[in-house]
Design a protein with these regions (language model features):
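Non-catalytic scaffold segments within catalytic domains of secreted glycoside hydrolases
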Residues: 1-115
Length: 115
């Protein structure tokens, strides 16, 4: 039995909100703005959310972590989770990453782009 089917049968009285979903990058600057791994991660996770909704799971929402790179309790500034890069060495200048543009398109269209 698949997880969505198990959920529908056993736990359908609860609503689901997926939150704090993130793909981290190292803070060494590698792929700091061109974050294709994050886009791939989001495609798979949002695709799974869509599949669950189509299967009848009552998903109420999805929250991406995070809008901007920030201080993480477990990692300090060594991991970057944001879809906007924060340059900690240059007055915290903010630069939208490729994932920002991709996620903006998804939100505006309310669907995942075709490959």
């Amino acid at each position: 039995m698949s997880c969505p089917n198990w959920y529908i049968i056993e736990l359908n009285r609860f609503r689901i909100v997926a939150w704090d979903d993130a793909e981290a990058q190292n803070a060494d600057g590698t792929f700091a703005v061109h974050d294709l791994d994050r886009i791939d991660y989001l495609k798979h996770h949002l695709g799974a959310v869509g599949k669950a909704i189509r299967a009848g799971v009552p998903v109420e929402g999805y929250f991406l972590w995070s809008l901007m790179d920030n201080f993480e309790w477990a990692h300090g500034y060594t991991k970057r989770f944001g879809i906007v890069r924060v340059d900690y060495d240059a007055d915290c200048r903010r630069v939208p990453k490729d994932s920002f543009a991709w996620y903006r398109t998804v939100i505006a269209s309310r669907e995942l782009p075709e490959e």
